[in-house]
Amino acid sequence: MPELPEVETVRLGLEKVTVGMQIMGGEVLYPRTIAHPQSPQVFIQGLQDATFLSWMRRGKYLLSQLSFSTQQPSGWLGVHLRMTGQLLWVAQDEPVQKHTRVRLFFVNNRELRFVDQRTFGQMWWVAPTEDPKQVISGLQKLGPEPFSEEFSVDYFWESLQGRKRSIKSALLDQALVAGVGNIYADEALFMSEIRPTTACHQLQTEQVQRLRTAIIEVLSTSIGAGGTTFSDFRDLKGVNGNYGGMAWVYGRQGQPCRTCGQTIERIKLVGRSTHFCPQCQPES
């Protein structure tokens, strides 16, 4: 699943090519992709003639504020890529990919396509009279952004106190911190020398400080590398992310640790593949 760096990479691409562009029309090829409104026709009608004012990211969600040429608000477009979703900026005469779910048309023969093999991705049109947080219910459950002041050491420490579940499990909880997923949880835990199985309540203050710093650092590094592509992620131009080749542990099971040479191990934890170095991340 695309995580914060991948979604931010897409957001940056959307900002460059769609802001100020007017939606001339569109079509929904897979109605289940549209989470709101219930009618795909109403979804397209709501977007018709609207202009993208800006794009923002909240956790793994993408949101664009829309406006008509009269400067009247025309609501919001929301997108969640889920496991395999891709937003591609292409020419309208380019052959339509097999798993294309939604097409939005612009001037100059350009088009924004939502391609999603697994069909878990979602899109929303939120009317001007509606609140995005009420319509896109997942927004209400998100914790602070990793780069925000709210994600302080004090907040992080207090949130982990008393929890007996593993720190890896906690990091996957979007209510704790928004946008971190399986890849960057493993990477940040390696960088902070914490075994993924360590219970939250066993962590010392300095470990929590190191982990917070590592989360921010690895997310920033991956954004700079255009995200990670291990399977489906592509940026707006269809280009793979480059962080995978830099990864410390994720996807490197059976290979030597870049720091100590010990073999990277992979286990299942809370149903997710979890990677770590037994030497650099000793058991508590």
From Swiss-Prot:
Q: Which residues are DNA-binding?
A: 99, 118, 163
Output the GO biological process annotations, alphabetical, semicolon-separated. base-excision repair
**InterPro entries xref list:** DNA_glyclase/AP_lyase_DNA-bd, DNA_glyclase_Znf_dom_DNA_BS, Formamido-pyr_DNA_Glyclase, FPG_cat, MutM-like_N-ter, Ribosomal_uS13-like_H2TH, Znf_DNA_glyclase/AP_lyase, Znf_FPG/IleRS
> So where's the catalytic machinery, residue-wise?
2-3, 60, 272
Which residues form the FPG-type zinc fingers?
Answer: 248-282
Summarize subunit and interaction data from the UniProt record for this chain.
Answer: Monomer.
Under the heading PANTHER family, the entry gives: FORMAMIDOPYRIMIDINE-DNA GLYCOSYLASE (PTHR22993:SF9)
Protein name (Swiss-Prot/TrEMBL): Formamidopyrimidine-DNA glycosylase
What is the originating organism of this protein?
Acaryochloris marina (strain MBIC 11017)
